[in-house]
């Protein structure tokens, strides 16, 4: 849906209404968009990057799981397969609620997913995600960008970081990070505390 909302002046709600009114148009768009995305991926992969990043904002998860499976998953599958064949790692970024998306991603060759936001911004329980999907893909993120990083104390950051490591660090495959970006006014002390905690406790 993210590729299409510009046709509706950036209004995702209008785009979704239009889909239900004219599904045949969106199906044609989806076919063209998939070809474009796969071609772009082929060009990027030819440059031998260290990593190919997929996704964007939370539009994958603002749509229903049915729409995500119909319009997003096929392209993700093809691009991840191409990257795997080229020996390039892949990461998918999708803000917001992502539990339903994570289940779909197990059908792909994706290497890593982020930001795995906890409630209220997302719906991820990190320990549960590690149990369910930790052997299939690497996990990145989960520290709350607002209540912990922006508004919390350094002690709060250390506690949350240690918990994330405990929840998802066993046997590796976890990148300690914030759940999405740090807000503009995030205290520097909190950022440095996150780095220090990762260096101190992040050996797993």
Question: Residue locations for each model-derived region?
Answer:
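Active-site loop segments of alpha/beta catalytic cores
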Residues: 1-204
